[in-house]
Amino acid sequence: QDPQRQLAEMARSKSAAAKKAALVGQGDLFAPADPAPAAAAPVADDEEVDETDALPAEPEMESAQTTPHDYRIVRTADELRAMIAEIRRYPEFCFDTETTRFDLFNDRIVGMSFAVVPHEAWYVPCDERSTPEYAGLLRPLFEDETIAKIGQNIKFDLMVLRRIGLAVRGPKYDTMILHYLLDPESRHNMNALAAKYLNYKPIEIETLIGRGPRQLTMDLVGVERVAQYAAPDAAVTLRFKRALL
């Protein structure tokens, strides 16, 4: 066979094989195409992802309604004597006063609350008849210099007690001043301290006396309702002192 013809046939054979190989690599053009991977859904430019879903939920604040407690109303002189005897077993006690309004020079005391352990407190209602007798029974306790006294904005309470003839002696702790010394830039009222240190929401005084021109005076509110407000204040203030020192 002519050598040139043989070379031509070999060339044509290689060309056909190459084309076949190329077609095999491409696959069948008429076969169903493999499904393409699903594309991610586009996010609109103005659509924001809520990152707070991944954050832990804020703990619900405690309150007098949700926290186990023992708040008692002292209604007689004998019950007051028993309360005083119990308080004397402790090295310190917290106290708070309630007045008709917030005018030190014209208001009248309505009651006092006392606490020596967290979540427990007494409320002692005071009227014009009982105040002199109760003040006489409480005088040795307030004048005892071996027992520390605790209050929130205690200067107000000291002045209220002075008006009914009670002098307060011994060590005194004011949680408002304590917090000012630790964190002078923050707020120091009871609601702020309760939220910050105890995750607790005190009862608002407006829930008892209202607000505005029709606001009541505290002596017009029932003793039970005042006790629900005043007793927790003493117990919470005691917890402030132990959290701050």
At which residue positions do the language-model features occur?
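Long, highly charged low-complexity segments
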Residues: 1-107, 112, 127-141
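Active-site-proximal helix-loop-helix substrate-binding element of RNase H-like nuclease domains
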Residues: 58, 62-71, 103, 107-245
